[in-house]
C-alpha cells in the first residue's frame, strides 16, 4: 500500500512539472482567458442590475394596493440599494434571475419610500419590522433605540415619487387608520371606542374620530326623538283637558270626574314611557359586555331594534287614544254621537300638534348635523395640535443626524461615536415626546371629568328652571280661549327650552376644546424648550469634549442644524396646511351628502303619504253606505296616524344616513390619505424625472379608481340600508292598516245596525201586535174580508216587484252600454296619442342609449293604462251600486206604502183607530208619498165571491226579499177556521189577560 501510494505521488509530481519552453505561452493564454472572463462577468452583473431595476419600476407602476405612509430619506434609499446590490452580487445567477417571494418583498421594501400618517401606531420599517410611535410606552421605545441610528434619518415630510407600495395587505389596523380592502364583514366587525360625550373623544388617543362622532350623532337623534315624544304626551294631556271643558261646560277643571280621566291618561302615558325606556336600556346594553369598544354591526343591530320598539310604542299610543271614547261613554254617560264628535275634535287638534312636532324635528335634525360637523372639525383640530410634536421630533432628529454625518465625513467624529451620540439624542427626544403625550392624556382626562361634572350640574339646574317655567305657563294660560294659539304658544315654550339645552351643550363643547388646545400649546412650549436644551447640550458641551473642536465651530454647526430643522419644519407646516384644507373639503362634501339624503327622505315621505291617502280614499269610496260624518272621522284619524308614522320614518332615515357614513368611513379615509400623498408628492420639486412623472400619473389613476370604488360602495350601501328603511316603512304601514281596518269595521258595524233598525219603531210594532189581536177577536172581521184584503195586497206587491225587475234590467243595460262606449272612446284617444307616436318614431332610430328610456316610458304608459282602467271599473261599479241603491230604496218605499195601505184597510175593517199619522220618513233621501188611510169599497160581487189567494200570489209572497220579508215577519200570519172565526198562529189570544184588555178596548170603541 505504501509503495503504491508513493509511486502515484511521484508520478503526479512529475506530471505537474511544466516544460520551460511552454511556460511563456501558458502564462499569456491564462492572462487572456482571465481578462475575458472578468469582462464577461462585469457585463453580466450590469445586465442583471438593469433588469432588476426595470422589474422594480414595473411593479411600482402596476401596484394597485393602498400606499403605505411613512417618510424615508433619499440618502437612505441609496444605502438600501447599495446593500441590495451587494447582496445580489453574492448570489449565483439562477437565484438572481428567479428571486424568492420573500426576496421580492424585502427588495421592494428597501427600495420603496412610503408615507405614513403622523398619528399611526405602528410604522413598518424597510426590513419588514415595525417600531411603535410615541403612543407606546417607554420600555418598548427603549428596546428599539439601539437600532434607531442605523435607520434612515427623516429629513423632511417631502419625498420623491417612489412612494407607491404594497403596504396595506397586512391585517393589522388601529382605530385611527385601517389599511386594507374594506369588505362588508370586516367593516361591520370594526370596533371603535364607545364614547358617551364629545369631550371623551378629545381626551382619548388613537381614537377613530369619524366613527365616534357619528355614534354621538345617533345618540343626539335618539334624544331628539325622546324630547319630541315627551312634548307630544304633554300636548295630548292639555288637548284632552281643553276638549273636556269644551264638550262638558258644566264641568270645572278641578272636577273630580275630569281629574279622574286626566290622571288615568297621565298614568298610562307614564307607564308607557317607563316600559319604553326599560326596553331601550336593555337594547343599549345588548352585546356590549364590559368592553369599552363597540362594533359597527352592534350599532346597526341596536338602531334597528330601537326603531322597532319605537314603532311599537307609537302603536300603543294609538290604542290609548282609542280607549278615550268608551271611557267618555262610561264615565260621562254621553251618547255615542257626542263621543264621536269629541274624538274628531281631539284628533283634529292632535293633527295640528303633529305638524308642529314635524317642523321642530326637521329643525333639530339640521341643528344636530351642524353640531356633528362642528365636532368633527374641533376633534381634527385638537388631533393636529397633539401630533405636531411628532413632526418636531422627527425633523430635529433628522437635522442633528445630518450635522453629525457632516462631522463624520470630515473625519472629526468616528462612526462609533456618531452612533452613540445619535442613540442618546433619539432616546432623549422620544422620551420627552412620550412624556408630552402621557401628560396631555392625563391632564386632558382631568379636564374632561371637570367638564362633565360642570355640565351635569348646569343641566340639573336648567331642568328644574324649565320645569317651573312650564308649570307657570300652564297655570297662566286659558285652554278654552283659542286652542290653536295655545298649542303654538306651548310648543314655542318647549322649543325654546330644547334650544337652550342644545346651546348649553354646544358651549360646553367649545369650552372644553379651547381648554384642550391651551393645554396642548402649554405642553408644546415646554417640550420645545427641552428640545432646545438637548441641542445646546449636544453641540456646546458634548461635541467639544468628544471631538476637541472649538466652541465657536460647534456653535456654527448648531446654527446650521437649527436652520436645517427650520426649513424641514416649514415644509412640514406647508404640507399640514394642505392636509387641513383637504380635510375641510371632505367635511363640506360630507355635509352635502347629508343634505342630499335629507332631500331624498322628504321625497320618500311625500310618496308614502300620497300612496296611503289614495289607498284610504279608494277604500272609503267603495263603502257608499257610510255617512259623510263617519268618512270624515276615518280620514281624520288616518291623517293623524300617518303624520306620526312619517315623522318616525323621517328620523329613521336620518339614522340610516349616519350608519351609511359610518360604513364608508374607512374608504373615505383611504381616499383622503391618497389625496394627501398626491399633495405631498406634487410639493416635492417642480422638476421631476420621467419615471417620477409616471409614478405621479399612476397615483392619480389610483385616486380615480378609489373614488369610483367609493361611489359604487356608497350606492350599494345606500341601497342595502334603504331596503331596511322600506321594510320598516312597510311595518309601520301594516300597523296603520290594522288600525284603520278596525276603525272602518266599527263604522260599518254601526251603519249596519242603523240600517237594520230603520223604520222599526217600537210604537209601530206595538200597534201591529194590537191590531192582530183585535182582528182575531173582532166580530166585524170575517175570513172573506181578510182574504180579499190579502189578495189585493199580494197583487199590488207583485206588480211592484215586476216593475222593479224591469227597471233593474233596463238600468243595467244602460250602464253596460255607457261603459262600452266610454271604453271605446278611451281606446280611440289612446291610439291617437301624439306622445306615443313620437316615442315610436324615436325608437325607429335604434339608438342604444334610448333603449332604457323607451322601456321606462313603456312601463310608465302601461302602469297609467292599468290605473285608468282600474279607475274606470271602479267608477262603473260605484255608479252601478248607486243605481241599485236608488232602485232598492224606491222599492222599499213602495212596499212600505203597500204595507201601510193594508194596515189602514184592516184597521178600518176591524173598527180600530189608526195612530196619529206622521209624515213617512225616507232615510234614503227619496221623495215622500202620502200614506192612504181610507179603504176603497169593493164591488158587490167581490163581497159575494171571495176566495183564498191563488198559488201565484203565495209564491210571489214567498219570494219577496229584503224589506218585504222583514215587514211580514213582524206581524204573525192569520188563518181562518171553518166556523168563520179567526185565530192567531202564535196562540197569543189564549192569554186571558190579553183577551180581556182587547175586549175592553173594543167596548170602548
Curated annotation (Swiss-Prot):
This is EvC complex member EVC. The gene is Evc. Keywords: Cell membrane, Cell projection, Cilium, Cytoplasm, Cytoskeleton, Membrane, Transmembrane, Transmembrane helix. It is found in: Cell membrane; Cytoplasm, Cytoskeleton, Cilium basal body; Cell projection, Cilium; Cell projection, Cilium membrane. The keyword Nucleotide-binding does not apply. It comes from Mus musculus. The lineage of its organism: Eukaryota, Metazoa, Chordata, Craniata, Vertebrata. Component of the EvC complex composed of EFCAB7, IQCE, EVC2 and EVC; built from two subcomplexes, EVC2:EVC and EFCAB7:IQCE. Interacts with EVC2. Interacts with EFCAB7. Interacts with IQCE. The keyword Ligase does not apply. Residues 1-21 are extracellular.
Amino acid at each position: 500500500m505504501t509503495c503504491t501510494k508513493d509511486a502515484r505521488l511521484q508520478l503526479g509530481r512529475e506530471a505537474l512539472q511544466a516544460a520551460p519552453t511552454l511556460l511563456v505561452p501558458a502564462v499569456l493564454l491564462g492572462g487572456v482567458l482571465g481578462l475575458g472572463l472578468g469582462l464577461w462577468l462585469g457585463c453580466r452583473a450590469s445586465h442583471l442590475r438593469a433588469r432588476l431595476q426595470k422589474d422594480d419600476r414595473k411593479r411600482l407602476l402596476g401596484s394597485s394596493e393602498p400606499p403605505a405612509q411613512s417618510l424615508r430619506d433619499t440618502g437612505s434609499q441609496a444605502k438600501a440599494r447599495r446593500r441590495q446590490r451587494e447582496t445580489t452580487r453574492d448570489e449565483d445567477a439562477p437565484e438572481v434571475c428567479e428571486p424568492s417571494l420573500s426576496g421580492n418583498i424585502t427588495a421592494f421594501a428597501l427600495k420603496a419610500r412610503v408615507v405614513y400618517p403622523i398619528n399611526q401606531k405602528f410604522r413598518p420599517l424597510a426590513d419588514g419590522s415595525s417600531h411603535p410611535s410615541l403612543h407606546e410606552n417607554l420600555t418598548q421605545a427603549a428596546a428599539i433605540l439601539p437600532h434607531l441610528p442605523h435607520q434612515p434619518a427623516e429629513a423632511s415630510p417631502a419625498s420623491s415619487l417612489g412612494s407607491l407600495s404594497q403596504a396595506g395587505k397586512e391585517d393589522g389596523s388601529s382605530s385611527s387608520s385601517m389599511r386594507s380592502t374594506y369588505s362588508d364583514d370586516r367593516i361591520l366587525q370594526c370596533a371603535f371606542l364607545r364614547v358617551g360625550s364629545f369631550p371623551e373623544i378629545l381626551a382619548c388617543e388613537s381614537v377613530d374620530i369619524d366613527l365616534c362622532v357619528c355614534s354621538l350623532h345617533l345618540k343626539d337623534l335618539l334624544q331628539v326623538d325622546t324630547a319630541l315624544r315627551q312634548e307630544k304626551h304633554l300636548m295630548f294631556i292639555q288637548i284632552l283637558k281643553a276638549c273636556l271643558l269644551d264638550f262638558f261646560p258644566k264641568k270645572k277643571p278641578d272636577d273630580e270626574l275630569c281629574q279622574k280621566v286626566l290622571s288615568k291618561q297621565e298614568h298610562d302615558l307614564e307607564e308607557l314611557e317607563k316600559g319604553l325606556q326599560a326596553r331601550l336600556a336593555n337594547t343599549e346594553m345588548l352585546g356590549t359586555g364590559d368592553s369599552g369598544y363597540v362594533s359597527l354591526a352592534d350599532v346597526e343591530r341596536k338602531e334597528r331594534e330601537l326603531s322597532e320598539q319605537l314603532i311599537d310604542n307609537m302603536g300603543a299610543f294609538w290604542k290609548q287614544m282609542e280607549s278615550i271614547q268608551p271611557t267618555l261613554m262610561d264615565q260621562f254617560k254621553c251618547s255615542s254621537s257626542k263621543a264621536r264628535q269629541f274624538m274628531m275634535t281631539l284628533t283634529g287638534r292632535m293633527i295640528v300638534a303633529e305638524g308642529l312636532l314635524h317642523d321642530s324635528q326637521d329643525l333639530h335634525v339640521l341643528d344636530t348635523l351642524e353640531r356633528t360637523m362642528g365636532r368633527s372639525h374641533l376633534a381634527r383640530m385638537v388631533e393636529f395640535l397633539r401630533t405636531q410634536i411628532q413632526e418636531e421630533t422627527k425633523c430635529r432628529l433628522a437635522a442633528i443626524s445630518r450635522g453629525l454625518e457632516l462631522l463624520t465625513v470630515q473625519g472629526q467624529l468616528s462612526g462609533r461615536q456618531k452612533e452613540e451620540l445619535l442613540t442618546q439624542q433619539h432616546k432623549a427626544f422620544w422620551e420627552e415626546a412620550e412624556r408630552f403625550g402621557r401628560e396631555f392624556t392625563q391632564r386632558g382626562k382631568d379636564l374632561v371629568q371637570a367638564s362633565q361634572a360642570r355640565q351635569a350640574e348646569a343641566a340639573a339646574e336648567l331642568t328644574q328652571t324649565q320645569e317651573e317655567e312650564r308649570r307657570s305657563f300652564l297655570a297662566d294660560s286659558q285652554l278654552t280661549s283659542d286652542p290653536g294659539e295655545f298649542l303654538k304658544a306651548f310648543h314655542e315654550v318647549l322649543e325654546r327650552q330644547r334650544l337652550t339645552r342644545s346651546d348649553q351643550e354646544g358651549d360646553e363643547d367649545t369650552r372644553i376644546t379651547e381648554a384642550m388646545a391651551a393645554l396642548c400649546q402649554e405642553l408644546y412650549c415646554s417640550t420645545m424648550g427641552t428640545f432646545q436644551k438637548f441641542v445646546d447640550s449636544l453641540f456646546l458641551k458634548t461635541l467639544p469634549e468628544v471631538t476637541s473642536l472649538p466652541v465657536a465651530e460647534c456653535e456654527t454647526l448648531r446654527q446650521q442644524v437649527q436652520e436645517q430643522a427650520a426649513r424641514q419644519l416649514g415644509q412640514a407646516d406647508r404640507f399640514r396646511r394642505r392636509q387641513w384644507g383637504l380635510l375641510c373639503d371632505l367635511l363640506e362634501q360630507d355635509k352635502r351628502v347629508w343634505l342630499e339624503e335629507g332631500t331624498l327622505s322628504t321625497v320618500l315621505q311625500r310618496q308614502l303619504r300620497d300612496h296611503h291617502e289614495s289607498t284610504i280614499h279608494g277604500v272609503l269610496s267603495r263603502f257608499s253606505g257610510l255617512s259623510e260624518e263617519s268618512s270624515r272621522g276615518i280620514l281624520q284619524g288616518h291623517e293623524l296616524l300617518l303624520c306620526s308614522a312619517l315623522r318616525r320614518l323621517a328620523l329613521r332615515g336620518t339614522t340610516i344616513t349616519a350608519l351609511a357614513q359610518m360604513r364608508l368611513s374607512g374608504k373615505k379615509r383611504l381616499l383622503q390619505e391618497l389625496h394627501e400623498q398626491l399633495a405631498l408628492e406634487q410639493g416635492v420639486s417642480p422638476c421631476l424625472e420621467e419615471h417620477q412623472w409616471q409614478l405621479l400619473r399612476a397615483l392619480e389613476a389610483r385616486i380615480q379608481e378609489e373614488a369610483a370604488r367609493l361611489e359604487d360602495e356608497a350606492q350599494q350601501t345606500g341601497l342595502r340600508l334603504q331596503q331596511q328603511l322600506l321594510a320598516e316603512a312597510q311595518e309601520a304601514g301594516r300597523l296603520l292598516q290594522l288600525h284603520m281596518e278596525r276603525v272602518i269595521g266599527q263604522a260599518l258595524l254601526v251603519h249596519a245596525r242603523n240600517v237594520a233598525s230603520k223604520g222599526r219603531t217600537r210604537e209601530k210594532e206595538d200597534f201591529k201586535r194590537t191590531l192582530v189581536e183585535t182582528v182575531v177577536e173582532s166580530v166585524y172581521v170575517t175570513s172573506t174580508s181578510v182574504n180579499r184584503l190579502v189578495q189585493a195586497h199580494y197583487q199590488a206587491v207583485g206588480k211592484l216587484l215586476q216593475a222593479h225587475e224591469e227597471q233593474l234590467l233596463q238600468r243595467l243595460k244602460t250602464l253596460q252600454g255607457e261603459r262600452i262606449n266610454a271604453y271605446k272612446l278611451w281606446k280611440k284617444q289612446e291610439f291617437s296619442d301624439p306622445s306615443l307616436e313620437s316615442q315610436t318614431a324615436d325608437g325607429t332610430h335604434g339608438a342604444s342609449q334610448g333603449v332604457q328610456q323607451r322601456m321606462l316610458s313603456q312601463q310608465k304608459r302601461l302602469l297609467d293604462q292599468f290605473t285608468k282602467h282600474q279607475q274606470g271599473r271602479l267608477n262603473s261599479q260605484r255608479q252601478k251600486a248607486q243605481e241599485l241603491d236608488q232602485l232598492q230604496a224606491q222599492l222599499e218605499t213602495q212596499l212600505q206604502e203597500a204595507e201601510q195601505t193594508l194596515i189602514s184597510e184592516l184597521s178600518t175593517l176591524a173598527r180600530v183607530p189608526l195612530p196619529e199619522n206622521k209624515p213617512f220618513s225616507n232615510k234614503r233621501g227619496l221623495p215622500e208619498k202620502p200614506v192612504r188611510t181610507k179603504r176603497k169599497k169593493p164591488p158587490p160581487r167581490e163581497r159575494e165571491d171571495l176566495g183564498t189567494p191563488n198559488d201565484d200570489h203565495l209564491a210571489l209572497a214567498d219570494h219577496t226579499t229584503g224589506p218585504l220579508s222583514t215587514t211580514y215577519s213582524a206581524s204573525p200570519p192569520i188563518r181562518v177556521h171553518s166556523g168563520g172565526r179567526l185565530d192567531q198562529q202564535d196562540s197569543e189570544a189564549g192569554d186571558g189577560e190579553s183577551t180581556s184588555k182587547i175586549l175592553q178596548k173594543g167596548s170602548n170603541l
